[in-house]
Amino acid sequence: FTFVIDKLDQDETGNALNSASALAREVRQVVIPEVDTYTYNKMVTGAGTKPDAITLTKDNIYTEIIKAGNALDNAEVPETERVLVVTPDVHLLMKQCADITMETDIGNDMRLKGVISNLDGATVVKVPAARMPKDFGFMLCHKVATVAPTKLEDYKVHQDPPGINGTLIEGRICYDAFVLENKAKAIYYQANKPAV
């Protein structure tokens, strides 16, 4: 990416528009979402266990998540460092599920803090639906299954380059993600069939 902050614009905003904040915003709002979207799509595509899509509800969400945990257990995936990736809509279902909120230690913690952060030994990570494939339900995974190398990540800020009265900001990031074939069973992906 490349963009310019003109000196006049910077001056008129009382220095609120400056190169450091603009670069940080670009990384936060563009680069990170793009890399996340790419990596999550690779993980979903390469998941070793993908049962048929079902309609997730507050009544079945807990059962489906512990089924995923059972599948990872049977595939001999380490129990530590598992991550449950959910969208805000699925997280809402989890909060509405009596099996989670009323009958578990997690429920006690949630009532105190108002958030579900761990379920069935997995850290719960809520990711915006826009970064996930269409009809994403949830994904239970372990870090051994995916590698996401960043080959190059370089950002430059040039003050008054030729032809520009201001700051030229450039960034370049080269990345990829791979699901290791022999570790694919460490990813369980459940698609969510929209309710009719």
Features from the language model and the residues they span:
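Alpha-helical scaffold segments that mediate packing/assembly in large oligomeric complexes
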Residues: 7-75, 188-196
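Residues at beta-strand starts and edge strands
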Residues: 21, 80, 163-167
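Intrinsically disordered or highly flexible coil/loop and linker segments, enriched in small
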Residues: 36-40, 78-81, 178-179
